Structure formats: structure tokens, C-alpha cells
């Protein structure tokens, strides 16, 4: 799912919100998360997961064109660890896909990640 698809899905799910408001909310949230990680902060969303930074050590790489060895400097990279509730929901969804050959969603409303039923 792309950012545009996420915005469209949220706008469709919550028609009381204007599409531009949904767009603004998603972009603002992603910007805040990016700024927090860039400043070295850890982000934890209970039930969903946590974002943190991992340090990659410097290493010796190879230029694929010339075969020459080059030093690749160390750097910090974002890391995501899924929360227990997200892992369970993904596992459950995988099991549902195996039992429903037509791929249709179940007839009952499925709870969202926070336990609320989708509108």
C-alpha cells in the first residue's frame, strides 16, 4: 500500500473527513515520525510496533563495475519491530486467506488494530 492508497482508504472509510484533511493528517504524522527518528528518538505505538535506529558498522564493499574494494562508511538506519497485536493480526489474516479460496472478507465486521470495528 502506498501513501496515496492509504490516504484514499482512510478517506473512504471515514467520509465525514474531507479528503484534504485526511491527506494532511497522514503527511503530518509521517513528518513527525521522520523528525523524531532523525533526532534519535524511539517511537512506540502500543499494539502496532516500535521504530528505532540501528547502527550499521563500516565495511569493505566492492565496486561492481571495476571490482575495486571501497570502504562503505557506517550509518544509522531505521528499524521497525512489530508489536504482539500486529503480529497476531497478520498471522490471523494469513490463516483466513488459506481458508477462504475466493479471497472475500468474512461477513462479520473485523476489529481494527485498536479493537474498534471499522465503520
UniProtKB/Swiss-Prot annotation:
GO CC annotations, alphabetized: chromosome; cytosol
Positions of region (Disordered): 93-119
Gene Ontology terms, MF aspect: DNA binding; structural constituent of chromatin
UniProt KW keywords: DNA recombination, DNA-binding, Transcription, Transcription regulation, Translation regulation
Biased composition (Low complexity): 97-112
SUPFAM superfamilies recorded: IHF-like DNA-binding proteins
Top-rank taxon: Bacteria
Record-linked SMART domains: BHL
Keyword Transcription tagged: yes
UniProt key word DNA-binding: yes
Single GO BP term: regulation of translation
Pfam families: Bac_DNA_binding
Function: This protein is one of the two subunits of integration host factor, a specific DNA-binding protein that functions in genetic recombination as well as in transcriptional and translational control.
Subunit composition and interactions: Heterodimer of an alpha and a beta chain.
Family according to the record: Belongs to the bacterial histone-like protein family.
Name by which UniProt lists this protein: Integration host factor subunit beta
Protein source organism: Bordetella petrii (strain ATCC BAA-461 / DSM 12804 / CCUG 43448)
Amino acid at each position: 500500500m502506498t501513501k496515496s492508497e492509504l490516504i484514499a482508504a482512510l478517506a473512504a472509510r471515514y467520509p465525514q473527513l474531507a479528503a484534504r484533511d485526511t491527506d494532511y493528517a497522514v503527511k503530518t504524522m509521517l513528518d513527525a515520525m521522520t523528525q523524531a527518528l532523525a533526532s534519535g528518538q524511539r517511537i512506540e505505538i502500543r499494539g502496532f510496533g516500535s521504530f528505532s535506529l540501528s547502527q550499521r558498522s563500516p565495511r569493505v564493499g566492492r565496486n561492481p563495475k571495476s571490482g575495486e574494494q571501497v570502504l562503505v562508511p557506517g550509518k544509522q538506519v531505521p528499524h521497525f519491530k512489530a508489536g504482539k497485536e500486529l503480529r497476531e493480526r497478520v498471522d490471523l489474516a494469513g490463516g483466513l486467506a488459506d481458508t477462504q479460496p475466493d479471497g472475500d472478507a468474512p461477513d462479520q465486521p473485523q476489529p481494527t488494530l485498536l479493537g474498534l470495528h471499522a465503520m
